[in-house]
Amino acid sequence: EHVSVFVIFAQTHEPSGECMFEFDEDEVFHVDLDKKQAIWYLPEFGRMFSVEAQGGLANIAAAKSNLNACIQHSNHTQAPNEPPEVIVFPKEPVELGQPNTLICHIDKFFPPVLNVTWLRNGQPVTEGVSETVFLASTEFRFRKFHYLAFVPSAADVYDCRVEHWGLDAPLLTHWEAQEPIQMPETTETVVCALGLVVGLAGVVVGIVLITKALRSSPDPRARRPL
């Protein structure tokens, strides 16, 4: 089963609105409100499909007009704030000294207002960072991805700091590289030798048991040379 989602929203806080299309939970394109053009998540999508950014901008303008009308005729009771769930993980298997990307996945929050900061050893990082637009999640909530290009090191630790109206305080989600444990060459040799000895012992025991079984068999036809 495949699912496509078309998200349009307008709100009184930044970002003031968004128009985005996704397929099977992956963004296809969104409309940049400042540049007034469609931004394709992958360049290949732009060669396969045609989208008029003006249509998305018109939809956002209509949503803003409807929002103002709703505010004027409502009792001004805001929807409850839903705090986000946050996890941090690397894009690729971690190898110390090899370039990688950290992913901060922020999910199931409302409204779509976030402040996200990457920290390395407790200090803000601004280089090598990128992010998606707000994506659709379950029950009219939102999700978002923030990325950090980095080189894993045993000396560095990272945090994804998320601020949201549903949180009493900024939420820090920690990540640090776990250096793989490598056995010394001598230890590997000993383990290999022990494995060989155990294997040979198993073969010897098997031969002895088979020989005893054949000798104790009452059927003379079973007594054949090995």
Swiss-Prot record:
Cytoplasmic-side segments: 211-226
Segments forming domain Ig-like C1-type: 84-176
What are the cysteine partners in each disulfide bond?
C104-C160
List all topological domains (Extracellular). Answer: 1-189
Q: Which GO terms describe its biological process?
A: adaptive immune response; antigen processing and presentation of peptide or polysaccharide antigen via MHC class II; regulation of immune system process
Q: Which UniProt keywords apply?
A: Adaptive immunity, Disulfide bond, Glycoprotein, Immunity, Membrane, MHC II, Transmembrane, Transmembrane helix
List membrane-spanning regions: 190-210
Q: What is its main location?
A: membrane
- One of its Pfam families is MHC_II_alpha
Q: Which GO terms describe its cellular component?
A: MHC class II protein complex
Q: Where in the cell is it found?
A: Membrane
This protein's name: RLA class II histocompatibility antigen, DP alpha-1 chain
